[in-house]
């Protein structure tokens, strides 16, 4: 995380094929981590065919969002992760019923070294790099990331990144 955050030359994606199995494996790992942390983890994996993107960057992005949800959701809290795709875009939605993010903080959470409520993050750990790095990854993958409230409590992160089908990539 720190190595990527230190880079000033930007993140350069290495595009390769990502199989549907990638999500099954990743979500199985997240289930274990959530269980070990006394959180409830649900997911909906609607990826049924391979697509092209940078798998390592995708995994880092997903893990940053998942780790934040774990960190700011209390015991017995719930985290949901939904993935689906069209021919041109991959969509990730991470929802939690944690402590949420204020409107003022939402404007700054993607800034490097910004930490929501310093006292709260000091307890939880972190350098204020995770969501900044998530934004850099999303930008490198030609996408968007947004955050909104999960009423009555919690946060929803929505990500949309550009992808290609394997057949289109091979023809270029």
Regions found by a protein language model. Give the residues of each.
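Conserved micro-motifs of the catalytic ATP-binding
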Residues: 8-15, 50-53
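Conserved catalytic submotifs in the C-terminal HATPase_c
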Residues: 40-49
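Short helix-loop "hinge" at the ATP-lid/N-box region of the Bergerat-fold HATPase_c
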Residues: 69-70
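Short beta-strand/loop element within the Bergerat-fold HATPase_c
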Residues: 76-88
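Acidic ATP/Mg2+-coordinating residue in the GHKL
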Residues: 96
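Short conserved segment of the HATPase_c
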Residues: 101-115
């Amino acid at each position: 995380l720190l190595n990527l955050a230190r880079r000033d030359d930007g993140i350069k994606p290495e595009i390769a094929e990502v199989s549907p199995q990638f999500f099954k494996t990743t979500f199985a790992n997240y289930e274990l981590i959530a269980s070990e942390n006394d959180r409830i983890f649900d997911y909906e994996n609607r990826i049924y065919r391979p697509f092209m993107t940078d798998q390592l960057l995708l995994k880092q992005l997903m893990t940053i969002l998942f780790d934040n949800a774990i960190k700011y959701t209390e015991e017995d809290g719930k985290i949901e992760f939904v993935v689906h795709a069209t021919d041109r875009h991959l969509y990730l939605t991470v929802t939690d019923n944690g402590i949420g993010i204020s409107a003022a903080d939402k404007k700054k959470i993607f800034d490097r070294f910004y930490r929501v409520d310093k006292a709260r993050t000091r307890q939880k750990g972190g350098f204020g790099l995770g969501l900044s790095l998530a934004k850099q990854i999303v930008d490198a993958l030609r996408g968007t990331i947004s955050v909104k409230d999960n009423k009555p409590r919690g946060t929803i992160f929505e990500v949309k990144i550009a992808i290609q089908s394997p057949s289109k990539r091979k023809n270029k």
